[in-house]
Amino acid sequence: MTTVSSAFATVAEGAKVVTPRWKKNERNGKLRVMCRYGGSIVSPPQTKSPRYVGGDTRIVAIPSSAETSFASLVSHLTVTLKISYPFKVKYQLPDQELDSLISVEADEDVQIMMEEHGYLSSESSIPQSRIRLFLFPLKSQQSNEAGASQGDSDQCKVETDIDWLGIEESNKPIREELTQPVLQHPKTEMWFVDALKSVEMMQTRRTNSGTSGSGDGNGGICGQESMMLETNSSFGSTSSSVSSSNLPPIKSSGEDNIANSQVKFAPIESVTSNDNSAVTPIPSHELPSHSHAFENKPSSNLYVAELNRPVPVPISGYPPFMNQAQQQHIQVIYTGQPYITGNSPMTLPATAYHHTNHVYYQRPPQPYPIYYIPVEQYSSRHVQALPVKPSTVLNYHQVDSPVVRTSSPLAPEFSSQVYPLSKPVDSSVQTSSEATLNTTSRDAFIYNTDVDDDNDIAHAQIYKSQPPAPTLPSQY
């Protein structure tokens, strides 16, 4: 008996060890986890840490049947959270970031998740230690949903663009034509070509209206026949013709002159007689308006047709004859440039005379040559000169001269031209010259010496006509 009880205790202890830990904290037989779905994980550039943005967060109670089966867990979450699309299950541990989520794809993954939750619950009862479930839609489902949403938006846009035209769904060809781009629509291009042709023909008609001849009337382009275009027009019409009601009125230069030359009179409503008889209204005959320019006329020349129209005469009540209308001439006044009198090419234009005062300029005085003459300077003090012998008088011609003198004898051809000259020596002149020597500068002596040398012809022939000294070769 004791052995059986001990064995039962051992089995009980073993069973206790095998029993999962998460069942210790069960409340009412269910496990509660936090579940987030419908959002997405983003990484803000400021924090650079992933965050779960959007979606809903709910606490889901998982029954015991879903703790070991992945299919049971998915079906329970689908029914509880009312999710209609396939999703992927991931869970986050409390000490991990959102970039470290753990995927749950099999029964073994579910059991591991429950064990982790049991360990956390046994160690701490803080709500933050719970495992968080995250439900993410599959990528194929996301792409399908995106395509479906885009298709729905395009369909709504097309219906919005077409429904205002009042076209029902049964007229699918018309709806398809209207949904095409406007610039690529074939009928739009045909209409544009027709409009260009019409404008070109109108311009040709206007230019040929004034230059066409007055023969059989076939020189210009015919009125109604030239404006018919057998082409496909826009919006389903098989043929189109440019009528005068759809085109603006076109006036040529001749029509403008006719309109300016016509005289319009107000219609006379009544004419009264002297006998106070009954009033008889007389209608006035008016010309047709210019808006009927494209009507069928026997003449194709609009310019001739305008000249042949009858002129209204309000007094007589009858239109004038054709010859009277033809005799009327159109007066054309050309506005030229104003007349400017000019001179003939053979005449000179008369210039206005203006009295001008002559200004006399006085010429500056003509410069005259300046001569420097040495003047003897006399001192206020009377210096008594000592008697000097004539033999000791200083000879002014013995002052050093820049001219080189040589002691070589004269050549025989120059000896006949040398004449000795004698100068009288005056004592008074010598005395004054001696006084001048003490008061004048060396420059005065040099000047006097040069003057005397120039006056002495023999001296100049002897000393100044000698050949220059030989030049020595340069050492460098």
Curated annotation (Swiss-Prot):
Residues in the signal sequence: 1-14
UniProt xrefs under InterPro entries: Gynoecium_Dev_Regulator (IPR053198), PB1_dom (IPR000270)
GO cellular-component term (any): plasma membrane
Any matching Pfam family: PB1
Start-end of Low complexity biased regions: 233-252
Consequence of gene loss (knockout): No visible phenotype. Double mutants sub/scm poq and qky poq have a stronger pistil twisting than single mutants. The triple mutant qky sub/scm poq has a dramatic pistil twisting phenotype due to defects of valve cell growth anisotropy.
Taxonomy, superkingdom: Eukaryota
Biased composition (Gly residues): 212-222
Region (Disordered): 204-256
Keywords: Cell membrane, Membrane, Signal
Tissue expression pattern: Observed in seedlings, roots, shoots, leaves, stems, inflorescence and flowers.
Subcellular location: Cell membrane; Endomembrane system
Key word Nucleotide-binding present: no
GO molecular function term, any single one: protein homodimerization activity
Its biological purpose: Collaboratively with SUB and QKY, regulates cell growth anisotropy during gynoecium development, thus linking together cell-cell communication and cellular growth.
Quaternary structure and partners: Homodimer. Interacts with QKY and SUB/SCM at the plasma membrane.
Protein name: Protein PAL OF QUIRKY
